Curated annotation (Swiss-Prot):
Phenotype seen when the gene is deleted: RNAi-mediated knockdown at the procyclic stage causes moderate growth defect without affecting the production of guided RNAs (gRNA).
Record's keyword terms, sorted: Mitochondrion, Transit peptide
Protein purpose: As part of the mitochondrial 3' processome (MPsome), involved in the maturation of guided RNA (gRNA) precursors.
Transit peptide: 1-97
Gene from which this protein is expressed: MPSS3
SUBUNIT field: Component of the mitochondrial 3' processome (MPsome) complex composed at least of terminal uridylyltransferase KRET1/TUT1, 3'-5' exonuclease DSS1, MPSS1, MPSS2 and MPSS3. Within the complex, interacts with KRET1.
Leader sequence residues: none
Cell compartment(s), UniProt: Mitochondrion
The protein's name: Mitochondrial 3' processome subunit 3
GO CC terms in record: mitochondrion; protein-containing complex
Taxonomy, superkingdom: Eukaryota
GO biological process terms on file: mitochondrial mRNA modification
Amino acid sequence: MKKAWAQLERVLQPSSSRVNRALITQQLEALYALPINCEAACRWEDAQRLFLRCNGHRPYYAGIMDQSTDNRLAVASFEENMLALQQRGLVCTTVGDKAPPCVVGGQTSRGLCRRSSIVCVNVGSCADLDLNMHEDCDETLLTLLHGVVVPYLHFRIVYGTGVSPPLVPRAPGPAICGASHDLSLQNELHMDSCVALLHPRGLCSSNCNNKAYRTAATLVRGAVSLATSDTLLHQRQDGCFTLHPDAMKLGSPRLFALQLWWNKEVGPVIQRGVEQSVKTDEVLSGAWIEVARKRVEELVERGGDDLPQPLRNMTRDDVAAFAADATLCWTLSAFDCNYKRLGPAQPACRLQFSEEARLSMALELMQTVKASLVKQPTGIPISELSATVCWPAASAWIGEKSLTEALTQFPAHFNVVNVEGKLVVMHGHLTGPSDNVTAEEVSEWLAAGHSEGLQKPCVAASPSDLTFHRETDLVVRAVAFLRKRHFGNVPVTYGELCGALLPKNNGKNDGDSDTLLNVLLRYDVLAADTAKGDSSINIQCGLRDGDAIRLSVREDRALRALEAFRTTSRSAFQLYTEAIEPFLTCCRGAMRENGSCVVPLTLLERWLQVERLSLQSKELLDILRSAEGPYRIDEELCNVVLTNHTAKGEVLTPAFSLPATPPPPPPPAVSSRLTFEAQISRVLKTQRPDRLLHFVQTILHAVFDLILPHVSAPSGVPVRMLMRRIRWGSFVVTLGSLTSFVEAFDGLFFEVLSNASSHGEEKRDDVDLIVSAYKGPVSPWLLYARLIVRLFPADVDIPLGLIAEALSWSSRFAPMFGDLPSLLRRVGRQCRNGQLLAKVEMVRPVCDQDDACLWELLAKIRREAHLHHLERSSGETGQYVLLSETELYAYLPNDVKGERWNSTVKEEGARCLATMAVHRLPHFFEWHVDNTDTTTRYVRVVLPFSTPPTGVVCFVEEYVCPLLRQHKQTTIAELDEQLGWSHGAFDAHPAGSQAAGGTPSATSLCGLLRRYVESMHSPKIILEPQETTLSPLHHHVHVMPNSAVYTSPEDMLLLLNGLRISNEGITRVLPTHKPVSLFELISQQLDLHQPFREGLTTLERGSRWNVMLACESDSMDDCLQELDNCTGDILVWCEG
């Protein structure tokens, strides 16, 4: 097969010596005498006269025959050329009673002739092509070139880019220039846009392995190369090609250059005049011919390089005659009898394969199926196999409709079985996986199908199916037009809708207009727009052209559901119930006859506008399959089969009515039952180092290579949109659901926030979460606590090499944190002989009752000291009060003494109380021994505003502050859990020992934070008790950053963008009135172009944005130069 394709490439390489010049000089001259628009038709006599006019000055047999004989030969040549063009399918002729407006009454006409809108190209067997068999190949390329490619490029120049070809999805690569709507790209085309003009169903450039696509691409490439060698086209380095700059100077074909020059220089002048005229007198044709004559004579006298060569040698009378003929053929033929512009029509092409080519394609198809089964010996679903082999396109050329029926013709190779309601293709029982389908078997299969087709006539589609397809296509076009106007908030009238859907007669035909209205009413598309008080309109009684219309209630609800699904606030099940199901129900109710009809999946995708929803065909099929609606899905041909007959007692619900009871929720997905914590536990229970290594490597790959590149925008990415971008489905089994994964590393790698559009609902939905990259400082302890200690168990010895290899430590973390053993030692872990030694974790539960007793005791002592009932002492760190153990015990309330300190010996209770106070609150109660009396031990009670130890300040500012957020209130219990303070995580940590002065796990974190706040002049944190009636325990004290002194990394990032977070009832992002750079704002906010999500709290309409140009120069030209050189800036700020 590769040899045959290489041979085809060599054959299609153009050569000037092999091109059929007779076809160019004769048939193409007659072809380009016709108008370029496929809808425009001119009289046979006018085209013949123009042909003779342009070729009469260049006799074919100069010096042999006289002028009259030459004219007769030219007439015969024109008729022969037109006949040959008709046989090739490039030209079609019709005999009509109505003549175009350019015809003078009383003349006998042989009919009208026009270009064919669809050109058929015959493709023979690629294997039989030989270097000597080049004539047929050249004729095929020339037919494709001058019948489709060049006319379409010419068509774009004449009619602009308002109409684009039916482009198909492309694989990633350069942009398709043919799909652009930039006026500067009107005369540019891309190779793929020309391949899209090859009309067959299912052609897609993403299926580049499909032989049909390769055939089409090879033909287009050969045609473009042929045009490039003949200086008709010019191919650029970016893959686009344009008309050659010297195309209007070509000597052959003459009429091609003349028509190109005419449509550029003369045609627009006549068209503006015709469009302004409303008369139909025959005299007007002569008037516009006179306008064209003057314009042509003016351009001929002016001369210039763009003037075609034939006009340079014409006399004045010949120029006038040429202007008259060209006006009749090329300009006025594009208007109807009422001087209304005909709708533009673009050429297209169909490929017709020979029997040898069909055999080659079918053989390659079966071999592809065989190769796919080798990769998946357990079987392939028929829908997946249909997409793999591109069956819709292959069936159109091979002539078979059902892939299942085609495979059942080869029972020795394939076996189609039903597995749980799905058709699955498996290997046959008589042959092995290595046995390929032979060409003889495929030939017998095709021959049998061909003979059956000869014996019994083909069953054509029923009239009801054809009518249904035409009506639904009209419905989709109408909905797309009305949605576009709805998004632009532009009112639309019924006349405008008719003009868009009926371009040929501009909606003026009452019969077509009534038919259109009937269709749109049956499919529940239109509703009268009564917003302006025009409530008297009854849409059932008919509409006038000036009546305002809008989308119906059903379509309006469907549009809202589509936009909600696109903005990640609706699930797939809600999309089905609110949009898809009502539409299919409406289609089923609009059927004229009982029975079944087929809705192509492509039609449903057009109605859904899946390109805006980022919804793939496979995902849409999964939605339809899971819903189990009143239809049947044909997975081979990607159709939805609807039925109109109802069972006895069944009542069809109207399309726009809501069900009486809400439908049952869909079963929870597998990903919602799998969490990241469950997957960690599963891996650690196996106690296998290889699985642990693979698990950790997968985590790092998902974090750094998969998720972080997509969440770098400061505004974050919604979870649903992130799921579509990274295709998380393949990681669910290993790492759990995406939501649980990003929440597991919240504050280390990611920042997970709740979307403000959730309206403060108590039950949080995972789809309302927004994920962004964590931009705060990451300390060694934070990395250890949130990553290493979670993935690697601390109760067993683990090789350091395993940890370093799993984490890719040398490439990902070593540049910031140094070597791994040093970091582990800094966090209190011991390393020896290449092993991370296990640690015995000491857990000391927090006793709220003891803490409440100590806080009450401290408050009573400080109150007595404030009233000067106790003697104060001063030291280096501040003021304090010295009490003996007995005196300290005396300040304890009596009820507490009886419940907690009920020891019979008073000294023993006092000793226990003092010991607990010193250990639990070491920075408020300290041991003190007098130098004069070493036998007596005192307790030193610290008074407020005493200087705290250095370790307390370092611990709070380095470990506590990075965990805080301005808009999020964090309790001390939550901080304790994150830091692992009470679980002994800081017991062997140097920072913990310096901060606590003893064992950190036995020390109250609340006491440490309170000591820091009361002793610092400007503390970076604030403690807010929630309930004043209770003691300030762990669960009742909130910790927040002091915004006057400290700014969290998240708030700092918002400040850089001129924003702040307000907690006035609901979390809102507000401006700070600080000027920020417009360029930095645009570069960071990647999602600014997206519309606001429904329900998102935004600024009031009264907010005013100020703009200031920050440049040194006063001249606008100099300012623009500074902006280009990045020396100037534009500052924006808001006065809310």
